[in-house]
Amino acid sequence: MRFPTPLIQGRLIRRYKRFLADVVLADGTETTVHVANSGAMLGLDAPGSRVWLSRAANLARKLPLSWELVEADFGAGAELVGVNTMHPNLLVAEAIAAGAVPALSGYARLRREVKYGLSSRIDIQLEDEARPLCLVEVKNVHLMRTPGYAEFPDCVTARGAKHLEELGAEADKGNRAVMVYLSQIGSARSIGLARDLDPAYGRAFDRARERGVEAIGLVCRIDPEGIEVADIIPMTG
């Protein structure tokens, strides 16, 4: 995924109300930007941090700038981290289509945002007449408290636990059900669960795994020009 226009640099003043942040641009202008991230963003929202913003194509949008990247140091030097949770579905779909995720390759069709169950949508659905339906749910990972070890979630997520339950139900039907955890921290070497931050999610994960839900860890390569899936990394559970 390449950013369609050059990103705009700035410094974070503060993040508030989850979806808003105040930023000072290089020319000294202060502006409010959209934050497409409902998580706690632990370690990523320190005032003064360098940030990169994208400009919306829709000129009529109330907040034309969106927060895309932040510079953070998790103990191994400064690096860029992706904070926009709208991108992971596309990033994983691109990686699957390119054959970069062997466990999910070889399907005849890839569809996104497909309705399933009673009132849900699956991020990615892989279809092939020769094998069971494969439903893929994607989660963005941007928490790191130990160098190299990324964690999910960074706050309580009842919605995330619901997704695990729904995937478990699909596995019970004989469909293939997969959770993909995508780290937008490029220095991640493995991904695990932040069970201390959301014990209920940890329990839901364990139940889903027992029912046959698979878990795949991926890590991104990030720069101001774009983001792409770089590698498969272990899921430690």
Swiss-Prot record:
It comes from the Bacteria. GO terms for molecular function: DNA binding. HAMAP family: SfsA. Belongs to the SfsA family. This is Sugar fermentation stimulation protein homolog. It comes from Xanthobacter autotrophicus (strain ATCC BAA-1158 / Py2). The gene is sfsA.
